């Protein structure tokens, strides 16, 4: 995961100090890209320990089209707690846009199912896109989509994915985003009869919050370790049938966790 440390170092050394919505302040750059070959290990950060359980359950929750945190709470995942209302609702966030994008004629479009079908029937399509950024509904969302749009690409029997992330909290959010979209790519590849290729991560505003500088410096002192391997139950052939128990991580030996505050 040298690529991630390079991003962090680049922002610290070359970024612009800015104010932000949360009042914390950031140092940021605009426009950056990382690439991860999914055939060379699962890109789960090793320079600090990550809570894989939260990453997997959040992705399964997105794929259900769910926008209430009850499922997450039932599975001891708290990463969305700060944004939910008193009923646990978040508004029409990621899952709703992925699975139920509202069309002007009253239909609801299942973008994930549509892309799956197109990967199988028309793998050379340049329209294998899912968007979570719906301008008509952004103001109704508890948090507008940070990871806003992703596109799939098939070549030589491998499925790759590129994510455009408009806003990236490098210390807390980005490690989760890398692992989540890498896993989604692997799951999509399996159910489409393909191998996993690359995950390409493209950023708009990539930033470190000012209250994360000390933690970032500590992480940069640590040497990356060998990437783990993600084993996925090969019997699952339907994307929407995956369960938490279908994933097994082997060989994860990270440095200790580094605590940092979330800016809401």
Curated annotation (Swiss-Prot):
Its EC number is 2.1.1.45. Its main location: cytoplasm. GO terms for biological process: dTMP biosynthetic process; dTTP biosynthetic process; methylation. It catalyses: dUMP + (6R)-5,10-methylene-5,6,7,8-tetrahydrofolate = 7,8-dihydrofolate + dTMP. Keywords: Cytoplasm, Methyltransferase, Nucleotide biosynthesis, Transferase. It is found in: Cytoplasm. NCBIfam families: PRK01827.1-3, PRK01827.1-5, thym_sym. This is Thymidylate synthase. It comes from Neisseria meningitidis serogroup B (strain ATCC BAA-335 / MC58).
